[in-house]
Structures are given as structure tokens and as C-alpha cells.
Amino acid sequence: MQRVTSYLPAGTPSSHPTAQVKLPHDLRHLRRKLLHLENGEMVMLDLKDPVLFANGDLLVREDGELIEILAADEKLFEIRGRDRTHLVELAWHLGNRHLAAQIEEDRIVILRDHVIRNMLQGLGATVLEINEPFQPARGAYHSHGGHSHDHGHAAHDHGHAAHDHGHNHDHDHGHAHGHDHQHDHNCDHDHDHGHHHGHKHD
């Protein structure tokens, strides 16, 4: 099986990929992973450090052949505002919830989340269901480990470090149980904080 230990950015001159691999956004943050190519072959990606790949980036096989990374279609919401100012306000609300977002001149694209859709519609946004590649802004996405739906895959691709970040975002949607609320869950701590092992009868 061929190994991949290096890569090239999208648009590298004189690059001619001979194979492709389609990946959703939450599987494009990689370090070591077995990849199934579109032609049925498999390669082992084995990089020194985790890399957040974008559509069109190239993996370099040991034999010199190039593999193009393609962003797979995903179930998304397309968000449009009344005007540019309104769209900026909507982007602020999404950013305040640490959601991965693809921000364009006249629209914002996010993963489908019906709670968020209701919020956006309440703010006057037009929200449509679409299926297309998702390429969230790299800044916040890279530093925070992505949207709530990321932790299931990203953690396995680049070690336990993902857990230092991923679990602080998903829980903004009404089921938080992060460190800020640790004393609300007595069973997770010393029993002196709550029910004294159930022996208190008075």
C-alpha cells in the first residue's frame, strides 16, 4: 500500500493529479488515516503534524503520484439576509455560537441545525436547504476544532488534542455540560457535594 507523507496546496503549478479522494469538512483535518480513493485504491496518510486540507489540495504519494482532495457534498443551510448589513448581523450571531461557517459576499453557509435555523428565521433571515461542498472559514474552524459535529471524526484523525477544543462548542445548543457547570452534576464528583452516598435519612 502506498503511503502519503507530504502534500501540496491547491493550485500548485504543473501539478497533475491521477486520483481523487472525496472528504466532508470534518474529515479534512488529518494527520494519519487510511484513505479510500475514488478509483477504489487505498493509501495510508501519515503526516508529521495535523493539517486542515481544503478543496483542491494535493497529497503526494511515495511514488510521486498526486491525489487531489475534493470536498464532498454535505447537507447544509444557505442563509441570506435582507441586505449586506443584515447578513453581517446574522454572521455575528453565528460566530457568537462558535459555528463553522462558510461566509460569502451574499450568503452564509452552515451545517444543518434546525435549532439554529429557527433562530435565524426569527431574526428575519431566509434559510434554504442545499447540498454542496462545505468549506468553512479556516480561522475559527482551525483554532477551535470546528463545529459541534466535528468531534466524532476529527479526534480520531489527529489525536486527543481535538478533545481540548471540540467539546466547548456543541453544548451551546441547550445541553451544556462543560467545565463551567461541573458542580451541577453531583454524580461526576466527590459525593460530599451532593448526597453522601445516599445514607442521609433525615
UniProtKB/Swiss-Prot annotation:
Family of this protein: Belongs to the UreE family.
Function according to Swiss-Prot or TrEMBL: Involved in urease metallocenter assembly. Binds nickel. Probably functions as a nickel donor during metallocenter assembly.
Subcellular location: Cytoplasm
Biological process terms in GO annotation: protein folding; protein-containing complex assembly; urea metabolic process
Superkingdom of source: Bacteria
GO molecular function: nickel cation binding; unfolded protein binding
Pfam families in UniProt: UreE_C (PF05194), UreE_N (PF02814)
Bias (Basic and acidic residues): 147-193
Keywords (A to Z) from UniProt: Chaperone, Cytoplasm, Nickel
Protein name per UniProt: Urease accessory protein UreE
Region of interest: Disordered: 138-202
GO cellular component, one term: cytoplasm
